[in-house]
Amino acid sequence: MSKTDPGNYFEDFKLGQTLVHATPRTVTAGDVALYTAFYGPRFSLFSSDEFARACGLPAAPVDPLVAFHIVFGKSVPDISLNAVANLGYAEGLFLAPVYPGDTLMAESEVIGLKENSNRKTGVVYVRTTGTNQHGKAVLRYVRWVMVRKRSAEAEIPEQSTPDLAEAVAAKDLIIPATLDFSKYDYALAGAPHAFEDYAIGERIDHVDGMAIEEAEHAMATRLWQNTAKVHFNQFERSKDPSGRRLVYGGVVISTAKALSFNGLQNAGLILAINGGRHVSPYFAGGTVFAWSEVLDKADLGHGVGALRLRMVATRDRPCDDFPGKDETGAYNDHVILDFDYWAAVPKRG
């Protein structure tokens, strides 16, 4: 009996299957420091204990994307070790803040399977839940990923595609129990813009660009114990037409989110992921730019508002003219990410 694990192929998954993922991870200040080094986020709520305490929290929580990447990384050996690409996200909810010292674990349920027409790959839909050391769920999300089949001849007897919500409803958003923005310090946060200053339909060019190098993306992906072959195995990737390793999509998400500080300085706290699509593969060396559109707004009380934001990232193309889809629905060739999320922002009133 082999003691090594080749990972699951598409035909190994079953609808309703539950996968408990190995290697619990205790979050440390070192994780926060490395996250800052890789992406350069500047949101005050995650940077300063004193700022966070003034907002009613016991200390600075980690950026929600840190928790997301850790939980995502736990799931990779069971779900996407043999992936072609991660395709998208939906129904993501951040249920509780995560602090250094918390230990995160993850498990996933297979909620959909769809074999592709080439019979060489299929799409696996999973709902992944991350819990802390107290057994409390801290985040939950759906993702779907294209996975290779071990054998093209393998039959897939039961297939189904889940019916997923277009967006998380504002009434379902969860803010940390003690969060209170009534004494929010806009000067220390870096900008005066509050909930009232953003209008539905408004578009914001985040101006700045950031290149991602080969070593950076590999280290950033290893930080989360993400083992997907497409990010690391250059020997195998040399057989692909691109001949290159794919950059983990989460690297693009976090880079674009860090860039969004310029224009959304007070919208760092992600509450939900409504949807997301990696529009085209990203390879290291290109410069990432980003722009955002305000899709909706909601008053959550306690001086807290929420903005529903569409964040679009591009490769090697500034976003002053907001590149996205054309009149036929086709994306601009430079677009690499289309990401829809809710973020908390302070209210003045």
Map each language-model feature to its residues.
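Hydrophobic alpha-helical segments
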Residues: 266, 279, 285, 316-317
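Hot-dog-fold acyl-thioester-processing enzymes
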Residues: 1-87, 149-273, 329-338, 344-349
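HotDog/MaoC-like acyl-thioester-processing domains
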Residues: 1, 5-15, 96-178, 284, ...
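Short, structured motif recognition centered on aromatic/hydrophobic residues
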Residues: 35, 89, 104-108, 124-128, ...
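A cross-kingdom feature marking solvent-exposed beta-strand/loop segments within repeated
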Residues: 85-96, 110-112, 269-280, 295
